[in-house]
């Protein structure tokens, strides 16, 4: 039978939409009797609905029929794990053996576990309320809970923390490649002393050739592969340290380690005061949680919590292995940057080759970590200075301009700060502890009260984190001031 109808191509589609409302086109594809779905979400977002808000385990952005957008392909769980792990395992791992020297093996190990648990809880609370209030950045969820002033303060903390961490990375690269006051550099050992191992020139070359191209990328998902490589290099470092320490332990050539803190001198007590903030700095990754979540494929709080838990487990193993084996290897001679210890005879076969593998491998690791930390630094600076402007992904000129300025400032900072201990103890006592514990605890307590979505245990843990953060900040800052005064005397 003849028909005037034609076959529709399989590649064609028809989007059904309602007429315009108030002169504006509708993007929803839901009939009017299903609009309560969106209204229920908005009620939960605004604290209406009581305990139902706690069961909201989806991200509405995953429902393109509600927003009229197609879901973009993002990173998978393991890509997100690599990026979040890279945000944590950077230079902080280098200072952990020195903290173990001060705290002793028992207290040091306990603190590694405790800080990991508290950090993971704070990340999960941050994710929950970020999704509930549809926040796209750390600063946005802070603003929902605490107001605009608190948001600006949190963004300043991110800038100080990330900027300080990136300065530390450059200091480590300089220490290892060109040497420091008491340790010879890799280039000195290979080529002898010359212009090629001048610290400032070397750092500048590394920044221009290796760091700048990676930092110019506009999506954190683009760094998943380099993050995976950086985690692999960190694992190589840990395995080498652990194997060498085990060999020396079996041979009986390791001095007995300290199991508890030393309270025998004023300097020992001051060191004890400043290592707690350094330990609290070790797990801070909260500034990158939201960017990673935003690009997570099929994102939901449950999926992001899984990312966080896998990441925490990896970091605990890496941190504990590095801290214990590094301290066992070098004992009381453990430096604040343990990489500088790897320029001496380790007392095993192929010691020289092992030293080169460890130092060069970790420098490559830091080169790959650098752009991940820089990403959230640049985004935060952009938000603070250019509020209301289009995202950086839509403004290549502004993105490149910010990248150049930030890299220049970080380079200048690396030439002025003497060592990583100085940088870590100040950022750990101030910005890091605020980002990792103070703000997440305040967010949970304030928004949890509004939405009635915090259990008694969660509320108690939030108060514990807040009290701990305040105590660590006060004690760490006082310890840092006394430490500087004692050195000046």
From Swiss-Prot:
Subcellular location: Endoplasmic reticulum membrane; Vacuole membrane
Keywords, in A-Z order: Amino-acid transport, Endoplasmic reticulum, Membrane, Transmembrane, Transmembrane helix, Transport, Vacuole
Listed transmembrane segments: 76-96, 102-122, 156-176, 201-221, 227-247, 269-289, 310-330, 357-377, 404-424, 425-445, 461-481
Keyword presence, Cytoplasm: no
Its membrane topology: Multi-pass membrane protein
GO biological process: amino acid transport
Family indicated by similarity: Belongs to the amino acid/polyamine transporter 2 family. Amino acid/auxin permease (AAAP) (TC 2.A.18.6) subfamily.
Protein name per its UniProtKB record: Amino acid transporter AVT6E
Organism whose genome encodes this protein: Arabidopsis thaliana (Mouse-ear cress)
